Amino acid sequence: MSAYAIIAASGVGKRMKLQGSLSKQFLQIGGFPVIYHTLSAFERSASVDSVFIATRQESIELLENMRDEYGFTKIAAIIPGGKERQDSIYNCIELIERQILDSGTAPDAILVHDGARPFIQPDEIDEIAALSAQYGACVPATKPKDTIKFISENDPGYFGRTLDRSRLLQVQTPQGFASKTLIQAHKHARLEQTYATDDAALVEEFFPEQHIRIHETGYHNIKITTPEDIHLAEAILAKLQSQQELTSSKKN
């Protein structure tokens, strides 16, 4: 099968409280930038043919240098992002649509991933891509560990009712969709100036008949959002590397 991946890497990282123009995608984990780990996973994916990155204008050269230094051969384009995450995704979608029109062929699925999620694994990417092609849409998720409550509608200083945790999932990326579905969802959103926090919400809005397949991943697929996440990420990386070394030694 064939899949394209869009990497959203334009985030400033306000909650990281970074100084100057430093982007959270370039913070170091295990001696390498966050975005390096992300791109490495997609480079090793068997199903992803091309990767399109939307980033800040001042980060384009950094990513081009990283592509050349580490031999990320699947990167098809590194382009400026937009004002919001959704605008950045749309910029990549426009480029992909032009490529589809020029070539006459479309990928079976398009995956959209947060650049600040460095620990998605190649086999997970392949599974999500396959399910997206089979069912039209697939989103990774994991079970919440904490009890979740509504805020009171009458007084925001108090809780409302408690949600049934057994029926809740924390949504992650990469989110995968049939090419036409994702492209059209973003076009509708652009036309109607509708914004959502993720791509699945746009598909839910404009293609309600499209059921979205759940693929449970794990707690390793975190998004780097706050300073505390860097320490957690170092621990996750160490565990993943230990597991990989153990698997490799067993094969040998």
From Swiss-Prot:
PROSITE patterns given in the database record: ISPD
Marked site: Transition state stabilizer: R15, K24
Domain of life assignment: Bacteria
Site (Positions MEP for the nucleophilic attack): R165, K223
Alphabetized UniProt keyword annotations: Isoprene biosynthesis, Nucleotidyltransferase, Transferase
Name of one Pfam family that matches: IspD
Molecular-function GO terms, alphabetical: 2-C-methyl-D-erythritol 4-phosphate cytidylyltransferase activity
Annotated metabolic or biological route of this protein: Isoprenoid biosynthesis; isopentenyl diphosphate biosynthesis via DXP pathway; isopentenyl diphosphate from 1-deoxy-D-xylulose 5-phosphate: step 2/6
Gene3D superfamilies, A to Z: Spore Coat Polysaccharide Biosynthesis Protein SpsA, Chain A
CDD domains linked: CDP-ME_synthetase (cd02516)
One of the GO biological process terms: isopentenyl diphosphate biosynthetic process, methylerythritol 4-phosphate pathway
Reaction catalyzed: 2-C-methyl-D-erythritol 4-phosphate + CTP + H(+) = 4-CDP-2-C-methyl-D-erythritol + diphosphate
InterPro entries: IspD, IspD/TarI, IspD/TarI_cytidylyltransf_bact, ISPD_synthase_CS, Nucleotide-diphossugar_trans
Annotated TM spans: none
E.C. code: 2.7.7.60
Known role: Catalyzes the formation of 4-diphosphocytidyl-2-C-methyl-D-erythritol from CTP and 2-C-methyl-D-erythritol 4-phosphate (MEP).
Family named by the database record: Belongs to the IspD/TarI cytidylyltransferase family. IspD subfamily.
Database matches in HAMAP family: IspD
Protein name in the entry: 2-C-methyl-D-erythritol 4-phosphate cytidylyltransferase
Species this chain originates from: Chlorobium phaeobacteroides (strain BS1)
Classification lineage: Bacteria, Pseudomonadati, Chlorobiota, Chlorobiia, Chlorobiales
Protein's gene: ispD
